[in-house]
Structures are given as C-alpha cells and as structure tokens.
C-alpha cells in the first residue's frame, strides 16, 4: 500500500489563498484551494495512494463517518468529494503532537505500507527520525504556492520508489530570494 501523509496548511492552501473554511459560527480558517486539491487528486490517480491526515485539522474529521458533525469535518469532506478523494486514516489526535512520532507509530501499525510520501510545509516534527523521513519528504511553502506541479511530480516519483527529499526550489527562490 502507498500512503500520502498529508498536512493541509501550506500544502492545500497558502498565504495567497482566498477560500475560507468554517471553524465555528464566527471564525473562519483559510480554506482548501481547488487547484491544490486537483494536484492532490493527480498524485492519488497516478499512484493509487491512500491519504492519511497529519494536519491539525485531523481532530475535526471523523474517519469512516458517512456524515461529519463538525463544521470543519463537513467542509473537508465536501472538498475531498469534489475531486473524488477519500481520507483513509489519520495519525493519533493531539494539538501539539509531534507529527513525526505520529507517522512513525502509524507506519509501525501498518506493515503493509510499501511506499510513502510526506507532504508538509514544516519539517520540524520529523527531525528526530531524519534518516527515516527525509527521503520521503516533499516540502511545500505556506509563503509560496503550496502543492505545486513540481511538488506533485516529486511526490509521484517518491511513491513510485524513486526516493529523494524534495524542496521546491522555485518557491525557495521566490519566497526567500535564494537558491
């Protein structure tokens, strides 16, 4: 089984995002962008990978529920359905939970995983197991464009066994003025 460990903020949205997601009656988050959702769908279509949530939004999403009760869960469900995607699972809940530990625990419980990719704009939660995670990591940028076509191509390669960490150099140059 191939798996995409998915963060939302900085991957499926970015600082330039216009869409909004309901958090409560009075508070709205930056939403999930349709173009980035289509990019995610391309990865799934070309690799048949399953999506496992690592995002902090995971606490609002009920895995396997036909009807989401939480407004954020409803929003996420609708966005994923529009591009014919399903969320397979999520790592353990917790607001300040180290994502790297969550991914490692999830992988330990699922020995059937043959390949995986991590799509995230933050690497800090993965440093403790750098050797394990780095070859599977595709770094996106909140200040850049999120899940770009370059990131999509890198994720597909990693899921198809061509390991190698990827940081979008075009975004690095645009956002930070460096290469």
Feature locations, PLM:
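Substrate-recognition element of Asp-dependent hydrolases with the DxDx(T/V) motif
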Residues: 44-67
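C-terminal cap/substrate-recognition subdomain and adjoining C-terminal extension
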Residues: 70-179
